């Protein structure tokens, strides 16, 4: 299955808030299908919704998510927490969390178009796994800085997680350490994703 490029608000109405997918929010009471979904939710449906939340928030394909679950399963720690750490340490997600891009798809585009440097080298792979003490900057040209400047100006500095720091004047971000579970930007039960 390829990456989702369809209407984003439909997914948000179905799955709940996905800040990485879009900044838009649906109008209240605008879902006519909601009244028909009453009663008990099946366990399979709950697990599937949690998995879909993870996929759409981080912009993953089914195969990528399975690969991350496989890698997390080999770790000695909790599989769910390792899975979230792997996803949160992706370059596209770190750009989004730093405020250098308004959404994760926007961050993917910045990386694919070679506007981003990691430790002084151009990286054009959005799934690049960042490590502690990595320095993320933009290219020195005006166009790259302009793209990031608009996003930084509109982002909220209070939402910056503890494992990241940003210098807004130099358009530079720093990964301090590996993420703790409480700073994940998505409300999700990762154990249900692993069970699925």
UniProtKB/Swiss-Prot annotation:
Residues 1-14 have a biased composition (Basic residues). It comes from Melica uniflora (Wood melick grass). HAMAP family: Ribosomal_uS4_B. This is Small ribosomal subunit protein uS4c. GO terms for biological process: ribosomal small subunit biogenesis; translation. The gene is rps4. It comes from the Eukaryota. GO terms for molecular function: rRNA binding; structural constituent of ribosome. Keywords: Chloroplast, Plastid, Ribonucleoprotein, Ribosomal protein, RNA-binding, rRNA-binding. It is found in: Plastid, Chloroplast. One of the primary rRNA binding proteins, it binds directly to 16S rRNA where it nucleates assembly of the body of the 30S subunit. Pfam families: Ribosomal_S4, S4. Its main location: plastid. Gene3D superfamilies: Ribosomal Protein S4 Delta 41, Chain A, domain 1, RNA-binding S4 domain. Residues 89-169 form the S4 RNA-binding domain. Part of the 30S ribosomal subunit. Contacts protein S5. The interaction surface between S4 and S5 is involved in control of translational fidelity. The lineage of its organism: Eukaryota, Viridiplantae, Streptophyta, Embryophyta, Tracheophyta. InterPro entries: Ribosomal_uS4 (IPR022801), Ribosomal_uS4_bac-type (IPR005709), Ribosomal_uS4_CS (IPR018079), Ribosomal_uS4_N (IPR001912), S4_RNA-bd (IPR002942), S4_RNA-bd_sf (IPR036986). Belongs to the universal ribosomal protein uS4 family. Residues 1-43 are annotated as: Disordered.
């Amino acid at each position: 299955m390829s990456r989702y490029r369809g209407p984003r608000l439909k997914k948000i109405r179905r799955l709940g808030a996905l800040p990485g997918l879009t900044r838009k929010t649906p109008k209240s009471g605008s879902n006519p299908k909601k009244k028909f979904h009453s009663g008990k939710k099946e366990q399979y449906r709950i697990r599937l919704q949690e998995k879909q939340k993870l996929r759409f928030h981080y912009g993953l394909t089914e195969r990528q998510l399975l690969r991350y679950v496989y890698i997390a399963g080999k770790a000695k720690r909790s599989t769910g927490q390792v899975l979230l750490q792997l996803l949160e340490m992706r370059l596209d997600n770190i750009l989004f969390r730093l405020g250098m891009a308004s959404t994760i798809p926007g961050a993917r585009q910045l990386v694919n178009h070679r506007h981003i440097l990691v430790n002084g080298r151009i990286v054009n792979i959005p799934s690049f796994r960042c490590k502690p003490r990595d320095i993320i900057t933009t290219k020195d040209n005006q166009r790259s800085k302009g793209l990031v400047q608009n996003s930084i100006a509109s982002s909220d500095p209070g939402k910056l997680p503890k494992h990241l720091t940003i210098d807004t004047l130099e358009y530079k971000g720093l990964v301090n350490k590996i993420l703790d579970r409480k700073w994940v930007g998505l409300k999700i039960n990762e154990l249900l994703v692993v069970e699925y």
